[in-house]
From Swiss-Prot:
InterPro entries: Znf_C2H2_sf, Znf_C2H2_type. Transcriptional repressor involved in light acclimation, cold and oxidative stress responses. May regulate a collection of transcripts involved in response to high-light, cold and oxidative stress. It comes from Arabidopsis thaliana (Mouse-ear cress). Disruption phenotype: No visible phenotype under normal growth condition, but enhanced tolerance to heat stress and increased sensitivity to salt stress. This is Zinc finger protein ZAT12. Pfam families: zf-C2H2_6 (PF13912). The keyword Zinc-finger applies. GO terms for cellular component: nucleus. Plants overexpressing ZAT12 show thick and dark-green leaves with round shape, short petiole, elevated amounts of anthocyanins and enhanced tolerance to high-light irradiation and oxidative stress.
Amino acid sequence: MVAISEIKSTVDVTAANCLMLLSRVGQENVDGGDQKRVFTCKTCLKQFHSFQALGGHRASHKKPNNDALSSGLMKKVKTSSHPCPICGVEFPMGQALGGHMRRHRNESGAAGGALVTRALLPEPTVTTLKKSSSGKRVACLDLSLGMVDNLNLKLELGRTVY
């Protein structure tokens, strides 16, 4: 049989332990039983408190050093621009200029895909939408357009489009 005084002392000790644990809520562990994990960089041995911080730091080892750029050890990046021969707009890459040149080409395929400027093309007709009695929008097209006579296709650069 267990004595009543023994049970009473066990309850008192348990209650005291609970009160001591509750009094430490929000404080760092002093006894070192559950230490925070430390993440160390394998390159420079710098320590971080989170894996994400270590990952961001590790990425900095992969970037080129700014000191090498300032001392001129790295090759100088050539900054060239590619101007459009028709309208003069400049592009940083030749590929962008090639995409831009499509704007100057005749999209209808007439004149063999030659370059034309928009100022020399006839004004496009605007299609108006009207509501019919049923409430639907209907496009009104003017089919009585005449041929464009004497269209001068001489470009500003002196080349003639055939």
